[in-house]
Amino acid sequence: AQGGLDNVSLRQINNAAGQRNSSAAHYHFGSKEALIKAIHEYRGGRINERRHTRLARLSTQEREQVRPLIEALVYPIVAEIEETEGGGNFIMFLSQLYSNPALDLMSMWRSHLSESVGAVYQQLRGVLPEIPEEVAGMRFGLMWVAMINTLADRQRLMVTRPGETAVARALPVLFVSNLIDMLCGAAAAPLSA
């Protein structure tokens, strides 16, 4: 994740994994794209599960508010970053996936994350019926990419410039709360046109 998806070979991945067999990753996955899909599936499945659990725990009142729904979008990914080995690398990896036109991202998205993210979106649509469907869809897509890239940028800064920027110095709770505030504002902003 740190050097970029396009700049790493399966041989380098084997070496980083401590594999003496230089073709182990190719043997197990067949290609770099298949390895990328496997990583996405592994991490995405856990995030999906966390998000479904969080949504199921929302009260009726919370299901009618923007913030608890946005929290259900954000916190499962934050948990993956903070609570799992390699979670910080995963968010940087995910950010790179979204900017790589060579990958079939939509098939990965549909199979591993879209179910729980779609549930959040549908509940937000119920809370914000005044936002037209087309606008709501665009906003949600922009919010998703902004969330992924913001979390990835913070992780990069924490690795490359710890303590040097306000983002890297911010306590995780403050940073995530601020991100959620921004996403809530984006979701519920009145139409200007």
Each model region followed by its residue ranges:
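Hydrophobic/aromatic residues within well-ordered alpha-helical segments
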Residues: 32, 39, 43, 47, ...
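Amphipathic alpha-helical packing segments from all-alpha helical-bundle domains
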Residues: 68, 86-92, 102-128
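Helix-turn-helix
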Residues: 5-34, 38
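Hydrophobic alpha-helical connector segments
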Residues: 52-90, 140
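C-terminal peripheral helix-coil segments that are non-catalytic and often amphipathic
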Residues: 114-193
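Secondary-structure edge/capping motif, primarily at the C-terminal ends of alpha-helices
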Residues: 54, 58, 101, 154-161
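An amphipathic alpha-helix adjacent to DNA-recognition modules
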Residues: 29-52, 56-59, 63
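Short alpha-helical scaffolding segments that buttress acidic/His motifs in well-ordered protein cores
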Residues: 73, 77, 91-98, 143-147, ...
